[in-house]
Amino acid sequence: AFDESKDSLKFLKKKYPFVNCLKRIDGILKFDLIFLSGVIHHIDKNIRKKILKKIYMSLKLTGRLIIFEHNPYNPLTNIVVKNCEFDKDAQLIKKKDLIKICENISFKVDDSAYVFFFPSSMKKFNVLEKYLEWFFLGAQYFCIFKKNESLNKIN
């Protein structure tokens, strides 16, 4: 696990002592999978590309990057983020903007969708989510990225 927040890593290590916590991501270690859930909106807009480049360099050629983020198009998500103490400095990012940044780094989108359309009190409607993944009002979205195969053949 890696987190810029040393406090988060201390908490993780205390609760799950078997987890290997990394002090930095520098591209030396290579991973099959890197998973970010609700992280990008905490990274300042001005350094997102730099951080995502480090992540790109830390993936194996066949590796995947999976990102889940809050959807700024969803009005309820905006209310939750606005009232969350952890999100005081949050800068939500649209799915298309995240994809654009990642494609500029040489990631290729493997899959993406909007998710979480219904609150838990309406879970019987969750079966409809697979038909709504294109609709921009899900509470969150995910993107699965891989390294651009045409560039991998060159490297």
Q: Model-flagged regions — what are they?
A:
Residues 90-106, 111-112:
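Short alpha-helix
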Residues 64, 110-155:
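A C-terminal cap/extension of S-adenosyl-L-methionine-dependent methyltransferases
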Residues 1-27:
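Class I SAM-dependent methyltransferase SAM/SAH-binding core
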Residues 69-75, 116-117:
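Short "lid" loop at the C-terminus of a central beta-strand within the Rossmann-like core
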Residues 62-70:
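Conserved beta-strand signature within the Rossmann-like core of class I S-adenosyl-L-methionine
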Residues 35:
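A conserved beta-strand element that flanks and buttresses the S-adenosyl-L-methionine
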Residues 43, 81-97:
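Acceptor-substrate binding/catalytic loop of class I
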Residues 49-61:
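A short glycine-rich, Lys/Arg-flanked "PGG" loop and its adjoining helix->strand segment in the class I
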